[in-house]
Amino acid sequence: SLSDKDKAAVRALWSKIGKSSDAIGNDALSRMIVVYPQTKIYFSHWPDVTPGSPNIKAHGKKVMGGIALAVSKIDDLKTGLMELSEQHAYKLRVDPSNFKILNHCILVVISTMFPKEFTPEAHVSLDKFLSGVALALAERYR
């Protein structure tokens, strides 16, 4: 679970990188579909699933909107992300193992876009936070 120190580190990092969340989302989703091509199955209804396509950009923005919501609900991710959990479990039917894949891509992108801000301490806290987000999103799968 997240300590107060972790929560403070995530909030501090987000305050520095949040304004770039659309670019982070686009890059992370683009990276995911290239490195983990099996994830494209969830986007087969899109006309263009290439990295940086309008659909990828739009969904990357949505994903990072969810991350922003999670930052604001950091004290109770399970309750705060219940609607998103229900949507992913019942409507979108996303295999929850994919949350971990996307989390890894988000970490990679943030580390390359913000090397100064992405200290080892920020890395640990953000990794724990994203793991908590994945767990909260998987809640409705049980």
Curated annotation (Swiss-Prot):
Q: Which GO terms describe its biological process?
A: hydrogen peroxide catabolic process
Query: What GO molecular function terms would the record report?
Result: haptoglobin binding; heme binding; iron ion binding; organic acid binding; oxygen binding; oxygen carrier activity; peroxidase activity
CDD domains from the UniProt entry: Hb-alpha-like (cd08927)
CC per GO annotation: blood microparticle; haptoglobin-hemoglobin complex; hemoglobin complex
Q: Which UniProt keywords apply?
A: Acetylation, Heme, Iron, Metal-binding, Oxygen transport, Transport
- Any one Pfam family here would be Globin
Protein residues bound to heme b: 88
InterPro entries documented for this protein: Globin (IPR000971), Globin-like_sf (IPR009050), Globin/Proto (IPR012292), Hemoglobin_a-typ (IPR002338), Hemoglobin_oxygen_transport (IPR050056), Hemoglobin_pi (IPR002339)
- The transmembrane segments are none
Query: N-acetylserine modification sites?
Result: 1
Q: Which domain of life is it from?
A: Eukaryota
* Record has Transport as a keyword: yes
Q: Which residues form the Globin domain?
A: 1-142
Q: Where does O2 bind?
A: 59
Organ and tissue specificity: Red blood cells.
What this protein is reported to do is described as: Involved in oxygen transport from gills to the various peripheral tissues.
Under the subunit heading, UniProt states: Hb1 is a heterotetramer of two alpha-1 chains and two beta chains. HbC is a heterotetramer of two alpha-1 chains and two beta-C chains.
Give the family this protein belongs to, as stated in its UniProt record: Belongs to the globin family.
Miscellaneous comment text of the record: This fish has three hemoglobins: Hb1 (major, about 65-70% of the total), Hb2 (about 5% of the total) and HbC (about 20-25% of the total). Hb1 and Hb2 display a very weak Bohr effect and no Root effect.
- Name listed for the protein in its UniProt record: Hemoglobin subunit alpha-1
What gene codes for this chain? Answer: hba1
